[in-house]
Every structure is written in C-alpha cells, then in structure tokens.
Amino acid sequence: MRKERKKASVSLSPQTVFAIKTCIYLALACFSGLSLWSFQHNQPYTQNWIGLLGWSLSSFLLYNFGVAAFLIPLYFGFLSFLNMKKTPAPLAFRKAVAFGTVPVCCAILLSMVSPAQNLPQFLATRVPMVVMDLQPPKAYLGGIPFYLLYDGNSFSLKLLIGAVGTGLIFLAILLCAICYLIPKSFVLKKKALLDALLKFLKNKSYACWSACKKLLKNLVNNKSYCPEPSLRVPAPSSFAKKEVLKLPTPVISLPLENKDLHDGDSSNRTIFLSPPHPAKRTLAPQKKPDLPDLLQKRTSSTPIPSSSPSPFIVAGEAPDLPQYHLLSKRNIRRPESLLEELKKKAAILQQTLASFGIDASIGNICSGPTLAAFEVLPNTGVKVQKIKALENDIALNLQASSIRIIAPIPGKAAVGIEIPNPDPQPVNFRDLLEDYQKGTQRLQVPLLLGKKANGDNFWTDLATMPHLIIAGTTGSGKSVCINTIVMSLIMTSPPTDVKLVIVDPKKVELTGYSQLPHMLTPVITESKEAHSALIWLVREMELRYEILRFLGLRNIQSFNSRTRNVDIEASYDKEIPEKMPFIVGIIDELSDLLLSSSHDIETPIVRLAQMARAVGIHLILATQRPSRDVITGLIKANFPSRIAFKVANKVNSQIIIDEPGAENLMGNGDMLVVSPGSFAPLRVQGAYICDDDINKVIKDLCSRFPCKYVIPSFDTYDDSSSMDPESLDPLFNQAKTLVLQTGNASTTFLQRKLKIGYARAASIIDQLEEARIVGPSEGAKPRQILVQLSNQED
C-alpha cells in the first residue's frame, strides 16, 4: 500500500494573532510619529529620521490632514492598545471607527479657519503651503482636500449647510466619538464629583428660595413693612437741593417678661405687628381636679404657650422648626473597587452553590451602607430549604463574619443572601432629615430610622404602627435608635402637634431632653413616677374618648380636621380643645421597671396598647432583655411593630420578631424591623447622631419655643383615683385612715380594728397596695407606708 504523508496544518493561536497585530500597530505608530516629528519643508529627506519613506509619508499625511495628521500615530497606538487588551472584534471595530472620526472631524473644523499666516516655527515648517490664488502662499491647517471639501468652487459644505451648520454637525460627531471612547470607570469617578457639585448648588438655591419666599410672605402679610428706613421724594427742578423725608419709627412697648429676649438697642430692629389675639372663651365652668389633665388645662387663664402669637412672628404663621443645616455633615465616599469586589463575591457564591449541587444564577447585586445583598435565582427543581441549610458553608467561602438568608424574597422568585459590606459606611441622620424635609411626603408622627440594605431611606409613621418595641443587647445601637426617634419627632413636628413623656431609669441617657418644649413633664427616672405617668396617660386616653364620643367622631385625625360648632361644644361639661396633639410615651429599660413593680407597670401599658391608637397616644418600649417575663404575651400581642438589634441567642430573636436571625446581626445599628402587614423582617442600618448635634438642636428649640410643663412632677401625683370606686371595699377609706394614723399595715391589725374576716382584710390590703398607699409585702418585715398623713384627707 502506498502510504500517504499527512501534512500537518499550521494554525496560529488567538494569543499569537493578538500579539502580531499589537506589534504591527505599535510599529506603525512609532514609524508615523517619528517621521512627522522630524519632517520639515525646507530640509531634504536625508534629515528625516525615517529617511525617504518617512519624508514621503509625512508629506502625504500633512498634505491631506494638516495639523490633524499628528493624530494618526495616536490612532495606530490606540489600535495596538485594543489588541493588547484582547478586546472582542465587534467592540474593537466600533472603537476603531470612533477614533478614526476624530482626525477627520478635526481636519474639517481646522479647515473652517481661514488660511493662516505667521504660524509658529513648528507648524510653519510642517503645514502645507500652497498657492491657491493667494499671494503670498498661506498655510492650510486642515489639509488641502478637507479645505476644498469645506470651501471648494464646485461643491462645498459651506455652500450646502453653511459655516454654522458645518461646525455644529462635526463638533457634535467629535464629542460623540470622544464620549464613546472615554472609559466607564473614568466617567463614574467624575460623576461623583459632579453630583457633589450639583448637590451643593441645589442646597444653596433652596436656601435662597426659602429666604425669598419668607420675605415675600412678610411683604404680603404686613402692609406696614418697609424694607428701607427712609423714603426719598424727588424734588421739582426748581429746587436747588433734594430733601430726604424720613418716616417716623413707631415705638412699641414690650412686656417686661419679654425684654430678656432682646439685647442691644431695640429701636434698630424690625418688629412685625400682629392684631390683638382675642381671649379664648371658656365654654363651661368646671371643678379644678387634683392634677389638671392635658386637655382640661387648656383654659383661657393658662393657654398652651405656642397658641399665643409672639410679637416677633407674623400673625398667622407658625415658627419654623430647626432645619438639617443645624446638624454636622459627613463626607462619605465609596471606593471604586467596591463593585468589582462584589462581582467577585457573586462569582464565589455561584461556585459555592454549584459545588453543593445547586444550579442557580446570580441576579441583582445591591450595596447599602453596611450590607451587600445578592439575589440568587435557583433553577427549576431546586429546593429553597437546601440553600438555607448551607448558611455556614456560604459564610465560610465568602469569608463573611455572618450572613442572613431570606428564602424566598417576598414577591420574587429569588433567594436573598445578605453579607457585610466590604467597605461599611455610617448612616448620617442629617442625610435622612435633609431628604425628608426636601421631599413631598409628610407623615403624622415620622420616625427617621436609617437606610435599607439597598441604600434607600427608611422612615415610617408611628401613627400607623401604632406602638413599638425595641430590643437589643448592650452596644447593639438601641440607645442611639431611641435618640434618633426623639430627634425625628422634635425636628419634624412643632410642640403643638407632638408631646413627649420619657421614662429613663438609667438617669443618664435621655435626661438631656427635659428642657424640650415638646415635653409634658421632665424626664422621669423613678419607677413610682413612671407608674403615675402611665396612669395619667390612661386617664388622658379615657378623657379623649369621652370627647370623641360626645362629638360623634372616630379618631384624632377627624377631631383635628373638624369644623368647630361652638354651641354644641359649649354644652359639654368640660372644655373641648381646638386641637389634640399626639402623645408619644418612650420607656427605656422596661425590664428594670417590671422588676420593681411588674403588675403596676404592665396593666396600664396593656390598656394603652389596646385602646390608645385612635386618640393619638403611642408607646415605644425598649429593653436589653427580651425574655418572656419582660415581653409578656399581652404586651407582645398589642405591639405588632418591633425592632430587633443584635440579641444573645435564637430564643430572644424568636420572642421579639417571631423567628431567628437577630442573633446574627452585626451590631452598631444593624437592625431587623417588623411592621404590621409585613411578610418578613426588613434589614435596616440605623442612623447615627452625635451628642453635639443633639445639644445644638435642643438649644435651638428652647430659643424658638417656651417650655411649660403640663405636669411639673409626678412625685406628688395621687394616682389612687385610677381605681374604680365601685370595686373598692366600703371600708377602704376607713382602713386607709387607720393605716396612716398608726403606721401598721397588716392583715391581722385590720381584722381586729374593723372586726372583719381574714379574706376581706387581705383584700383591703391588696387594694391599698394597688393604690400605692402601702408597699409590697417583704416577708416577715412590715409593709412600708408610701403616703404621709399630711397629704391625705382626715
């Protein structure tokens, strides 16, 4: 048999092809660049660095492109760069065409310039000098062909679309080509700087517009407003001198108690006059209670401070609230490598799932202040529970301290995996407040809490929650969250709309808010005062319900928006206020209060949680120990909204948010928020505000609004009347007198003195303890007498 020789086919690898092209384009770039640089008209070709070939190539390029010929070496260098990066062929072709339009457009734009004279030495010896009916010869900056294309005899762009049209068209093509060639990373870097500049200009324009708007309001509402102290009257032409007529300055006598608001000469200040405020009518006489309630205290003799207009405020216009400019600003910059790092994490995540036999792809990638979230799209047949079981393995491969798996994401065919952000950034409270004040959305009782995992702002309305429980260990961000909530209320609502009752058993966290004009009473630090405050809130709730029932209204919103009927309201035995403010009760360290008097604290809390929503009374409870003896079944059932910071174990997480997950949080403001109607807890990074900003806001509010407590102190508040008189024993008052006179509060003592049985005497002792006349039982020790005889009726 004849053997046939097989010739081995020679084929080059793609890497070799790219390397050859790169070398060719780089050689052409160097060849053309050196020949153009060493070319001159008045020198022989022997002086050119590339010799005759270089001199001829330079003459050709300069004759056809003029000054734009110096872009040709850059064009070849760009082609070499594309091949060096192994750019795909379609993309490389588009970029090559885009770069090729640059010298063409430059040549046409340069041809629009008249043939130039007196060029620099470098250009005069290189640009073509041709005699075209011009004496002496002149240089054509864009080359002879492009000059003829622009301003030729038979056909020209100047004749077809004019000089302006030619310039606009080719300038637009040039800019489009340059924009297409600019790398995306460079655009993103400059975009951050441009966004910062635009935000600065927007803030300044907003401030200017607010000042102009306020000035226009002053001009409209005050007819006597005069922006200048004097008025110049033009004199007739016969007058030799012009006279200036000055308006007399009115002298206003201020009350003595308001003179401390002014310093310096008051005659130089502009004072807006308001019409006299009519005295508020007392609708019906009433008896003075032991301690006036919030609604009963609003009489003509003691009006709410903010209801009477200040002589320095335009009539009909409420004082402004503190703006976000008062808070400190932090510049937060994201590193450019964050997106690339998250893409690498996504690739590792997909490989990890594939190694465990889970076929899935990665969808959207969201990056927030401290979290990064990945959407995993499992293929058909993959069990979601199988992904959730790999939580520890995924955390190991991603090198994450902790992860959280949402399986599945509500409303999506995907599984969410949240990991710590490689470059965490704090959330500044000023940014939230700025976005809220500039936005159009307005909430009744706004809480600006922080930002979601995707970077969006998160705020909610306490009026719809309607009560809130906050739980977390020490250092998890619970106290900062409470400060953020208080700052949200006082910087978005005036004292006439929101009132606060704050209980702080630690005595150091929240006592600085005592001077706020929003406070009904100074910050409460004792458990006895806390119980009295809760009893007062229950009475206030009952009083508001009585008023709503009398007027036939359903809630506080309909009451505040009603049209007042003076005749009907005057027939009620108590004065009906014009407006009911929202009341927010904030209790920190609930577990400490429950340890001291569990039944006394829990009962009014449950009553308020069950009934107080419609009348605008809301509770916010905070605790470090979310155990079942603190968050009882009754409290948990009436608090549908909860915030869980990092807790100790899964049991505590199950108690606070009904599922595990809070034990894996990162701390420092990382929280899970459960709201009514939500399908799953929402991951939020809490906002941070420093103590200096809090002090500045409190000082600013105290200078704007007077602080007048409705209840100066709960130390002397008698809450025994909170018990139903019908449920008291007929011998209750007699037993109370005996106990206070003798100082003996024992069951056997009441049996002997009142000649009753043991069961009835023990019941009376329990009623005295509930009325906080005697203390709880201490075993063999006698009960403590909590009320002095001088404060009781004989």
Swiss-Prot record:
Segments forming domain FtsK: 455-654
UniProt biased composition (Low complexity): 299-311
Main subcellular location of this protein, as a coarse class: membrane
Function: Essential cell division protein that coordinates cell division and chromosome segregation. The N-terminus is involved in assembly of the cell-division machinery. The C-terminus functions as a DNA motor that moves dsDNA in an ATP-dependent manner towards the dif recombination site, which is located within the replication terminus region. Required for activation of the Xer recombinase, allowing activation of chromosome unlinking by recombination.
Name of the featured protein: DNA translocase FtsK
Chain spans, region Disordered: 265-311
Organism: Chlamydia muridarum (strain MoPn / Nigg)
Subcellular location as annotated: Cell inner membrane
Cytoplasmic domain ranges by topology: 180-794
Alphabetical list of InterPro entries matching this protein: AAA+_ATPase, FtsK/SpoIIIE/SftA, FtsK_4TM, FtsK_alpha, FtsK_dom, Ftsk_gamma, P-loop_NTPase, WH-like_DNA-bd_sf
Sample GO molecular function, one term: DNA binding
A biological process term (GO) from this entry: cell division
Domain observations: Consists of an N-terminal domain, which is sufficient for the localization to the septal ring and is required for cell division, followed by a linker domain, and a C-terminal domain, which forms the translocation motor involved in chromosome segregation. The C-terminal domain can be further subdivided into alpha, beta and gamma subdomains. The alpha and beta subdomains form the DNA pump, and the gamma subdomain is a regulatory subdomain.
Transmembrane regions: 17-37, 59-79, 96-116, 129-149, 159-179
Binding site for ATP: G475, S476, G477, K478, S479, V480
Gene3D superfamilies: 3.30.980.40, P-loop containing nucleotide triphosphate hydrolases (3.40.50.300), Winged helix-like DNA-binding domain superfamily/Winged helix DNA-binding domain (1.10.10.10)
Topological category with respect to the lipid bilayer: Multi-pass membrane protein
Domain of life: Bacteria
